[in-house]
From Swiss-Prot:
This is Bifunctional protein HldE. One of its GO terms (biological process) is ADP-L-glycero-beta-D-manno-heptose biosynthetic process. The gene is hldE. It comes from the Bacteria. Its EC number is 2.7.1.167, 2.7.7.70. Keywords: ATP-binding, Carbohydrate metabolism, Kinase, Multifunctional enzyme, Nucleotide-binding, Nucleotidyltransferase, Transferase.
Length: 488
């Protein structure tokens, strides 16, 4: 990769992005389902916990901040609890400023997902789709336009980006010399005419143009149709999932960018990361092609993340330099980093499992245990004893492999999603911190003797005893290696 892409993210910290669009509160309600309602043939969810996140245009702004830029968010909320929750979350982001219009007659858009295990049972939307106060929105937009470098219009068809607001915002940005990126929702792409770049996904492009199918030629045809629909639109970037991206710049041949993900764990939030990266790159003078190439790298990073939907400038620099050669590195985290990852998993309703051990000289017994552990959950955390902890448990000659090597080997296994080192004699503190849904140990234990089983069972979790492979142990391996050779 050339130096241009590697240098761009370092300049993000001085860039400011104005995000105008539909701001939402995403709420997740988790619980257990173990019976059907006697009133109707529907499941009964016993609610256990709730989490909330910035959604819609708010998530684009959060991605800008995560990449090192500053975001100014313009949208509308109601005078209600959901609106106040959104404001509080924004206030906690130091690089995110808001100019939200509070409309007492309007409900804050709120999406509530009811989740049991790894299954979404129901989504309930509270929203007003009527037109928001365009005059107030444009006043807030124009008040901040001069201080920013680029504009993102995040359209979720909730009444903020009406045709009138779109035309006025694009015209004002053009007059001020600010690039405009559109993440569209309307099937009528002509309403985004005059923007610098439009970023539909494959489905949105097909619905807007009528061009359907797969492959590079189809994507190029769809991109050309988009530019024909909006004669003053400079470029179209169609995101195509595993097929990568297709960029069409007016007057130039289309360019197909293959997907860069080393491994795909979670695609949630990838579109917002792409929009934020495009905005920051264009703000720093990148060409549409270089901006798209960098956004493609960012998409590859974010879908390889475990339960998170943001990337950092440092990660982009490393990948652009070709330094991100080992995807296993992303699976090794300290406790704080791991807790953030696990929170992301839980926000998506994934069942979290935990097991632990020294894992010195990995053997088939270890692999079998880890495979059984992963089969019992959606995401598996492995607590790994540090070198000092192993030495206290096993004696001064252990471990054979240092903790860095042991962690890397574990992280390279597909069954393992996260590796966290611990220095104590037992993983009890990790178990209390992570609160796994499933705790797994070998069948040489009983449920009662598994460390942390009382904690997990007390909050309704499950303890699984994995079957062992006979004769497989690190101690036996070391003994055989140290035994004198027989014969000549």
């Amino acid at each position: 990769m050339d130096d241009t892409l590697a240098k761009l993210p370092r300049a993000f910290s001085g860039a400011t992005v104005l995000v105008l669009g539909d701001v939402m509160l995403d709420r997740f309600v988790y619980g257990a389902v173990d019976r059907i309602s006697p009133e109707a043939p529907v499941p009964v969810i016993a609610v256990e916990r709730e989490t909330t996140m910035l959604g819609g245009a708010g998530n684009v702004a959060r991605n800008v901040a995560a990449l090192g830029g500053r975001a100014v968010l313009v949208g509308v909320i109601g005078d209600d609890d959901a609106g106040r929750a959104l404001t509080a979350m924004i206030d906690r982001e130091p690089s995110l400023d808001s100019a939200l219009i509070v409309d007492a007659k309007r409900r804050t858009t709120e999406k509530t997902r009811y989740i049991s295990g790894s299954h979404q049972m129901l989504r309930a939307d509270r929203e007003d789709r009527g037109e928001a106060d365009g005059v107030a929105l444009l006043a807030a937009f124009n008040a901040h336009l001069r201080e920013v470098d680029v504009v993102v219009l995040s359209d979720y068809a909730k009444g903020v980006l009406t045709p009138v607001v779109l035309r006025a915002a694009i015209a004002a940005a053009n007059a001020a010399g600010k690039p405009v990126i559109v993440d569209p929702k309307s099937r009528d792409f002509s309403r985004y005419d005059g923007a610098t770049l439009i970023k539909p996904n494959r489905r949105e492009a097909a619905e807007a143009t009528g061009v359907t199918g797969a492959g590079d030629e189809v994507a190029a045809e769809a991109a050309d149709a988009i530019l024909s629909t909006a004669p003053n639109l400079a470029a179209a970037l169609i995101t195509r999932g595993r097929a990568g991206m297709t960029l069409a710049v007016r007057g130039e041949a289309p360019v197909h960018l293959p997907a860069t993900a080393l491994e795909v764990f979670d695609v949630s939030g990838a579109g917002d990361t792409v929009a934020a990266t495009l905005a920051l790159a264009l703000a720093r003078g990148a060409s549409p092609l270089d901006a798209a190439r960098l956004a493609n790298l960012a998409a590859g990073l974010v879908v390889a993340k475990l339960g998170t939907d943001v990337v950092t400038a440092d990660e982009l620099v490393g990948l652009a330099h070709g330094e991100h050669a080992d995807p296993a590195v992303d699976k090794i985290a300290d406790l704080d980093g791991a807790l953030a990852i696990v929170a992301g998993w839980r926000a998506r309703g994934l069942k979290v499992g935990f097991t632990n051990g020294c894992f010195d000289l990995l053997h088939p017994g270890h692999v079998s245990l880890l495979a059984q552990a992963k089969a019992a959950c959606d995401r598996l955390i492995v607590g790994l004893n540090t070198d000092a902890s192993v030495q206290r448990l096993k004696g001064p000659t252990r471990p054979v492999q240092k903790e860095t090597g042991r962690a890397t080997v574990l992280a390279s296994l597909s069954a393992v999603d996260l590796v966290v080192l611990f220095d104590e004699q037992t993983p009890l503190n990790l178990i209390r911190a992570f609160r796994p849904d499933v705790l797994v140990k070998g069948a040489d234990y009983t449920v009662e003797t598994v460390v942390g089983s009382d904690v997990v069972l007390a909050y309704g979790g499950k303890v699984v005893l994995a079957q062992l492979k006979a004769g497989q142990s690190t101690t036996n391996l070391i003994g055989r290696m140290n035994a004198p050779a027989v014969g000549g």
